[in-house]
Amino acid sequence: MSFEIIAKDLAGRVGKLYTKSGVIETPALFPVVDPRKQELPSAVIERYFGQIITNAYFVYRLTGGRAVDIKKVLSWNAVLMTDSGAYQILRYGSVEVDPDEILQFQARIGSDIGVILDLPFDYEEPYESALLKVEETIRRAKRASAMLDKLEDMLVVGPIQGGLYLDLLATSAREISKLGFHIFAVGSPTTLLEEYRFDLLLEVILHVKANILREAPLHLFGAGHPLVLPFAVALGVDLFDSASYILYARDDRIMLRDRTLRLEDVKTDYLPCSTKLCHKPVKELREMPHEERIQLIAEHNLAILREELLEIKQRIHEGTLWEYLEIKARAHPTLYRFLRSLGRYKRLIEEYDPETHPETHGLFFYQDTAESRPEPHRHWSRTANLYTPSKVAIVIRAGEKPYNKSWEYRYLKSLVGDRAHVLFYDPVFGLVPEEVAEIYPLSQNEAEGESEAARAFAYEWLNNYDVILLYRVDLPMLSKKVIPLRSLDDVLHYI
């Protein structure tokens, strides 16, 4: 197995996952197909996705443990992933199958990617019970690890459990990471997704990501809504699976990129989208037979999910994934709250986020979220130990970019030469020394508002100087000789 990373932004990756039946471009979603009843033909799913997931436990029960060609059963010729029945444990408490047997069964029926049978639990599980289930999952994972070479080239997923207990998540992630699985997965997020607790779910992902092998593919079970996908990808999730497309369709729920509509709530003659479904009059949709409507809405939902993943991939290539998160975060308060809190994980995000992209784009910063982004923190950490060539600082607020091409800077340098160190005051980065002004993205950005953290950094940095001359900048300091300049020519009075 090989996982090749093509492009990065934040902790998100565009990559290629090689399986025995083909290559998956990530981020990728596996639509769930029920082997007991296919409500949407495989040919329809294949128009939008080149991979599916089905429940090996259901197949096991249907055949009495007899191996069948699962791809032939489902009329599917591309990459196929199987789950082991863990979701049924979450819902009903147990399944009647041995963990080792169901893993071997997945290989025998021709699965390209299989999952060990872990013990999932929801986020309300008491700590003592959660600890026991994590320990049992690790024991099962160790047994599965010993079988990896005997599973007919099937890639195997190691789920990481822990609920909202961060110590259990970290322990589980570290232990599972040692066992040689091809893919890791975040377990038991379903309840959080159902309750729109996106902020808690994303925090779980961050803690898992911090404790697994850096380059390993990461799967998120049960996530299939366009709102959560870009955030999960930004934190390092590569693979998803979901039955949301068909579950929503059964209830006449129609996915859009930023929300979900119920058919009964649509007031316009047509839906506000551009898929095949959206060209049908709403009145006609309401009057058609329910089964026919399910198929149409399900196909529409698949199309919307595909659109979302394509947008995410393009954003990663551009290096504008954060800007996309800014847009999506306004769709739900928990997403907005999480985006603002990402500064707590700045070191982790900065570690994964590439400094440059093949095709750089100007970045957009907003006052309420700028402090959470990795770029300002990277600048502050790097300039903290930068040599200061003079004990006299001139701080100017220049409007033209790059800053060291502005007329103010060029005129100032003609007056003082190297007798003072020129710094540019930036509302996001704080102070930008003249010698690094053209480094991306210090001059390649647009900002709205001023970051308090940037101002705090400016005060800290200015402690390196004995005399501070300010031009069009308000930075009062009691402990320093701070002199506001009415014009640039006034600088000659002090140097």
Swiss-Prot record:
GO terms for cellular component: cytoplasm. Signal peptide: none annotated. Binds 1 zinc ion per subunit. It catalyses: guanosine(15) in tRNA + 7-cyano-7-deazaguanine = 7-cyano-7-carbaguanosine(15) in tRNA + guanine. Keywords: Glycosyltransferase, Metal-binding, Transferase, tRNA processing, Zinc. The keyword Magnesium does not apply. GO terms for molecular function: pentosyltransferase activity; zinc ion binding. The active site is at 83 (nucleophile). Zn(2+) binds at residues 273, 278. Its cofactor is Zn(2+). Transmembrane segments: none annotated. Substrate binds at residue 118. One of its GO terms (biological process) is tRNA wobble guanine modification. The gene is tgtA. It is an enzyme of class 2 (transferase). The keyword RNA-binding does not apply. Exchanges the guanine residue with 7-cyano-7-deazaguanine (preQ0) at position 15 in the dihydrouridine loop (D-loop) of archaeal tRNAs. PANTHER family: QUEUINE TRNA-RIBOSYLTRANSFERASE. This is tRNA-guanine(15) transglycosylase. NCBIfam families: arcsn_tRNA_tgt, tgt_general. Its EC number is 2.4.2.48. Pathway: tRNA modification; archaeosine-tRNA biosynthesis. Belongs to the archaeosine tRNA-ribosyltransferase family.
